[in-house]
């Protein structure tokens, strides 16, 4: 979903910094697509076989002072989004942040409730119908059915 955002704004005066993480070099994909559309691109692998050793969240926070983002867009597995949310809270970052949740979706219309996530305040949301993009403070990333 983030590649489409980059494509949509490519002709604008907006600047994008992309940080991607993979398990190892064999899993790296779409490198050129993000590299060409971003003002800054950084990649990490868990084992250091491509780019920096580490993960995308570490890359992001390592470059945060240079980036000075107006908005943060993130997509990835729940543990990564959880680490991003914790890092933002620990640093007192008040920049709007939106996450695209990766959940199994059974029916795609919200009827089966397979993709339910818990929102802040105790309500539930259906990722397929109410999302999949939410403000990071709007969802509880620790909770799973």
Where are these regions (language model features)?
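Local cysteine-cluster metal-coordination motifs and their immediate loop/turn environment
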Residues: 1-4, 78-80, 102-133
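Short acidic, glycine/serine/threonine-rich loops at helix termini
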Residues: 85, 110-111, 139
């Amino acid at each position: 979903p983030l590649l489409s955002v980059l494509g949509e704004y490519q002709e604008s005066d907006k600047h994008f910094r992309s940080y991607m993480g993979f398990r190892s070099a064999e899993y790296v994909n779409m490198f050129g697509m993000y590299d060409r559309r971003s003002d800054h691109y950084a990649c990490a692998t868990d084992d250091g076989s491509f780019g920096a050793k580490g993960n995308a969240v570490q890359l992001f926070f390592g470059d945060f002072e240079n980036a000075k983002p107006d908005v943060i867009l993130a997509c990835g597995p729940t543990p990564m989004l959880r680490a991003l949310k914790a890092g933002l809270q620990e640093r007192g970052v008040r920049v709007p942040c939106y996450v695209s949740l990766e959940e199994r979706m059974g029916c795609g219309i919200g009827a089966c409730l397979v993709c339910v996530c818990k929102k802040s305040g105790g309500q539930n949301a259906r990722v397929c119908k109410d999302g999949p993009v939410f403000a990071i403070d709007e969802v509880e990333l620790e909770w799973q059915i």
